[in-house]
């Protein structure tokens, strides 16, 4: 039977010493009140006990008071505010009470308060810090990622002769890893004379969390060689390391180790095993484990969903989501993210719309970032705007990820001004926010502004990363800033400590080639310290198409196909160069080779968003419900353009077509023309027509878009594979340099 009733106030007997609370507490009285404290199951009961202790004088006993305070500070119903009041009533808090206060603050919402409590302890009491004090202070330093504070506490622990204590040392290892100082963590680990399993776990999990999974596995091997018995925490860390580096063989060995050594397999460890199998691509092993698990939580279901998504079995992933006993936002996010990251943005948006129909399901930052990325890919500006409004309406914090995603979405959907507005609205910007804005400027051909922003970023004491440089080089490429790109490239390692990767080399080749410096681009490739990749040769091949350099094109294509024989893009590019030069026999031969080998040219596809719906058009497409009206508008537009001096650029026809009239008809069927015409019949001025194309816009379509913008007084924005084109009053923002 319960001692306390949760419904009724606690009934305590009148104490005979009520009139004299300062009378010394007997052992029986102390034991009785400590028993009462330990039986409390609510804050209300604890406060009743507190009041009785004050009335009876028991609270003046430091030991009893400290026990009451510990329950107020650390129990499941703890209240830091109440605990502090209890602490302040203790006449002379002992070391246990001070350490309890420090521990409570270190585990609370504001860990820095534990440091202030520590300072009060050393300045206001006769108590000295001991081996129980420092672990929680060091934990607070780790929580706020303050390396300097951690180092200071380390020094104080050494001076207090507890620096080598295993509990203190383990806390220091965790703190140094949390602050990114791996070397100091390793030094502390080596100084521990009698390492316990927590010491090893702290190192293994620290390496995993800080991106050194290989070191984690090496340390586990050493741990095993020293006959240290691993715990389930060890196994979780090791399996996470295997998952990160996709080491299925080692992961399976770990699973065997768990079975052979009878390691306790709780739900956390089972989920780690499942995660390892899915991340390593062994969906069969994952399915067997999943089916065998008697206990499952949402992490289990979401991990399995992720596994199917990784293996591109989206039907099975959907089935897992539908079968979940309780679908949470994490599961929905997993499916949206899986589609978005694997080139299926339309499917990601479909899932997002399903999520919107769910009751009591609150969107979080992860949901919004993934969905904004999908919007960016397909050009869903209206949905992106809705998400931005949702963020404002619901007070969702604009962290760096959300800010970057918004900037990226607006930029890729053609609204650069809105990107600037979002960028300027935030005071704190990290490297990803700066890089997103630089990338947006690059896509829209604002090369000089992008380079200026690169330097402003450094003035703001934000160090660029590899993505930043990629975006700056793209900006230079679209604006012809060759000298600036070369200068920044040579500064990457010397000034910024960033070793150029293959994508950076490809960017410089693109900068040189696009500006006509083909021979210089070849010499640059020959001087590369790493083997040229397909992206490098692809950049050179693309430049050869622009400048019709057949000899270099054939060489670049040969090198590219040596690395990736089934690269359809390389075949198409070379075929287009042959066609541009009138070498139709070569075109025929290359197209025949593609048919025989099963290679297919990616069809031209353009999309346009009208009233929140994405409408797609393929070249020569008749599938759209309004195709008849679209083609009627196309005929009207082309006739109007011809009457104003337009002549089709039949040199842009890259198929083998004999009759001039058929060549002209072929040009008219390009997907971007269809999308623009649909925009003309579906919207009215001054609404901007925004079109997204998957391939490079051809010269004829470029000329047509300029003329339409002039003759119909419409602003047209086209995003092709490489950049944006803003058509206004018969002119394009690219100045015909693309």
UniProtKB/Swiss-Prot annotation:
Name recorded for this polypeptide: Pentatricopeptide repeat-containing protein At2g29760, chloroplastic
Please tell me one Gene Ontology term that the record gives under cellular component. Answer: chloroplast
Q: What does this protein do?
A: Involved in RNA editing event in chloroplasts. Required for the editing of a single site in rps12 transcript.
The ranges of region (Type DYW motif) come to 643-738
- Type E motif, as annotated region: 536-611
The annotated region (Disordered) lies at 11-30
The segments labelled Type E(+) motif in the record are 612-642
> What UniProt keywords apply to this chain's record, in alphabetical order?
Chloroplast, Plastid, Repeat, Transit peptide
Please give the PANTHER family that the UniProt record associates with this protein: PENTATRICOPEPTIDE REPEAT-CONTAINING PROTEIN
Transit peptide limits:
1-42
Please name the InterPro entries in this protein's record: DYW_dom, E_motif, Pentatricopeptide_rpt, PPR_At4g14850-like_plant, TPR-like_helical_dom_sf
Q: Where does this one sit in the cell? A: Plastid, Chloroplast
**Family as reported in the entry's similarity comment:** Belongs to the PPR family. PCMP-H subfamily.
Polar residues bias located where? 17-28
Q: Where are the PPR repeats?
A: 94-129, 130-164, 165-195, 196-230, 231-265, 266-296, 297-331, 332-363, 364-398, 399-429, 430-464, 465-495, 501-531
Q: A GO molecular-function term, please?
A: zinc ion binding
Family matches, as Pfam families? DYW_deaminase, E_motif, PPR, PPR_2
Disrupted-gene phenotype: No visible phenotype under normal growth conditions.
**Per its UniProt record, what SUPFAM superfamilies does this chain match?**
TPR-like
Question: Which GO biological process entries does UniProt record here?
Answer: chloroplast RNA processing; RNA modification
